């Protein structure tokens, strides 16, 4: 989730991590999410598929890749994405130039929001909001659930002190350059299952066996730290 402007050091860090980790991660995520979307909906029977990307950030590369991949596979279906984050007016002018993708401030996603979506993507966002803010997280997910047929959540599992520190380090490296808030805690398996239970969601599938970085990340690339949950 993008929060604000950054200085020169942060911009340099952002460019560095883009080269050594993010392109590869984005390719893995794009393939996984696109494949699951194809499995969940009878896409070729629909003229339009609408995606909601919550906390999409300033880097538009992932949602662009997903739209492009789905569009090339299903040529008779139009894919449209609405992306919400804490964008400034200046940022919205800069990034709102991509066909079939619209970027809006998160405030536009009000309780009176009438648009309906086939899928809501919540990609590595919830832990940045702050999992200690239980009510806020619950209200956000509840709102997204009301307007979306499926929720696709990508997030992290921690298992104790060491894994918590490992994930904090990874988040610092990956997100400090964008001015994103670095979290203190992450889901564990129990807290995530309590989270979806309170929302009365059904988990259709959980993906926990994928590596999102190249081999040289060693322990940091432990697949048990990452998960994708598909909910309805």
Region spans (language model):
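Short catalytic micro-motifs in class I SAM-dependent methyltransferases
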Residues: 124-128
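Core SAM-dependent methyltransferase catalytic element
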Residues: 214-232
């Amino acid at each position: 989730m993008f929060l604000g402007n950054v200085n020169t050091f942060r911009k340099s860090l952002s460019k560095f991590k883009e080269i050594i980790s993010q392109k590869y991660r984005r390719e893995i995520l794009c393939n996984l999410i696109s494949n699951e979307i194809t499995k969940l909906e009878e896409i070729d029977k629909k003229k339009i598929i609408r995606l909601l990307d919550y906390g999409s950030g300033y880097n538009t590369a992932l949602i662009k890749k997903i739209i492009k991949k789905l569009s090339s596979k299903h040529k008779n279906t139009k894919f449209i994405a609405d992306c919400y984050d804490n964008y400034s007016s200046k940022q919205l002018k800069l990034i709102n130039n991509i066909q079939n993708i619209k970027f809006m401030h998160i405030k536009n996603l009000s309780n009176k929001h009438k648009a309906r979506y086939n899928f809501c993507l919540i990609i590595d966002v919830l832990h940045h909001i702050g999992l200690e803010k239980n009510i806020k997280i619950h209200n956000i997910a509840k709102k997204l659930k009301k307007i979306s047929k499926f929720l696709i959540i990508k997030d992290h599992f921690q298992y104790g002190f060491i894994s918590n520190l490992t994930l904090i380090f990874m988040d610092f490296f990956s997100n400090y350059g964008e001015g994103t808030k670095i979290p203190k805690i992450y889901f564990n398996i129990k807290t995530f299952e309590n989270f979806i239970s309170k929302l009365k969601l059904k988990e259709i599938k959980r993906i926990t066996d994928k590596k999102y970085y190249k081999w040289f990340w060693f322990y940091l690339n432990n697949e048990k730290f990452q998960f994708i949950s598909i909910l309805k």
